[in-house]
């Protein structure tokens, strides 16, 4: 059962995961407006970076409207209460990028790896701790390994110095039982002082439910975003999550009405593609595909005259993971070739 006396650490990701929804094009003005609203509403941290983390701006992932440091500096100069967080994927961002983000005002960092590759986070976690940052391990695509194996990876991150480790449902393939099993496995091996967190997506409409189940199984921190602004069908919608836990009489420290207003008045008008469950975003969850593949897959489908749904299902069959965005075009070309051969045989 959830401890009603325990304060939930509310981690907003509108200005990082939400970058995916608008192709990393937040203006500084929009970033400041969102950060100010979140800060006033009482969230604990506000994550800021390119959608793929520090140094993610690239041909492979898409170029940002601004640099990570420009966004971080703007938000850090705005907030009065919330901590500024950022994300780093080893192999994309470096310790030099992390130092620059720290100097720009970031005080929380989430070091993200694939769920079976925690060992590549050692250098970055140790460096973050040396800076005095609140250091979090972030195990992406957590559905792709067993609860026990995931817990071993979490234990590695803890051994490097991570103060919190997350179950990250990047592929949106976890149901409530899956979430419960992973947090129970974490609890069995992690030091009681090490916190745990949940990063949910909403492609199967389970973002809020999975986050609440995580809390029921000892989770300390929950990620969410205004309107669910994020990759795929988005993250757990922050305003919905807070409304739900408020009705449960759980401690969250946020103003529900302010979050609802910020979601509707500031964030929703920025969406060039509605962040919702639809044919394409549902396909991501159904196939267990990395949520940030959405916009890349839609572009490939339009270019080659294919179904985005079919491409995503094939990506799922091939067990593609984050960082393999370049393979989306390869898969599309394979499917195009197969269709042409089928047409020739039919003729």
Curated annotation (Swiss-Prot):
GO BP field: catabolic process; L-leucine biosynthetic process
Catalytic activity: (S)-4-hydroxy-2-oxopentanoate = acetaldehyde + pyruvate
Keywords: Aromatic hydrocarbons catabolism, Lyase, Manganese, Metal-binding
EC number of the protein: 4.1.3.39
Enzyme class: lyase
Chain positions recorded as Mn(2+) binding sites: 17, 199, 201
Binding positions for substrate per the UniProt entry: 16-17, 170, 199, 290
Active site per the UniProt annotation: 20 (proton acceptor)
Domain Pyruvate carboxyltransferase, residue spans: 8-260
Molecular function GO terms recorded: 2-isopropylmalate synthase activity; 4-hydroxy-2-oxovalerate aldolase activity; manganese ion binding
Site positions per UniProt: Transition state stabilizer: 16
InterPro entries: 2-IPM_HCS-like (IPR050073), 4OH_2_O-val_aldolase (IPR017629), Aldolase_TIM (IPR013785), DmpG_comm (IPR012425), DRE_TIM_HOA (IPR035685), PYR_CT (IPR000891)
UniProt similarity note: Belongs to the 4-hydroxy-2-oxovalerate aldolase family.
NCBIfam families: 4OH_2_O_val_ald, PRK08195.1
Protein name in UniProt: 4-hydroxy-2-oxovalerate aldolase
